[in-house]
Amino acid sequence: NELGVRTAFIASADQGHAHDPNGPYGYDETSKAFDEYVLDAVKSNNLGKLLELTQDFIERAKPDSFWQMLILHGVLKKTKLRNTLNVYECPTYFGMLVATYE
């Protein structure tokens, strides 16, 4: 960075929360579609794609991650960081994604 200081930014949030009809938010197929869209955005290093999602789509998917990923998108626009997708799992009613940017 401009100051020559190492900096860390951590965006922590779960993906869609409507993967399981027995979960607290019920089931909506949009959760799976949202998670797949986010996975593609991370894999292609193009979080700007998230700006194309509609409010209805986001609300139906019930993610915690949307705003944090937009902030990360802003950070990535100002840096030359590239990502590594570490893991995506959906072990319960919500999806989880871990990516490292260096």
Task: Enumerate the language-model features and the residues they cover.
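Active-site beta-strand/loop microenvironment that shapes enzyme catalytic pockets
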Residues: 1-34
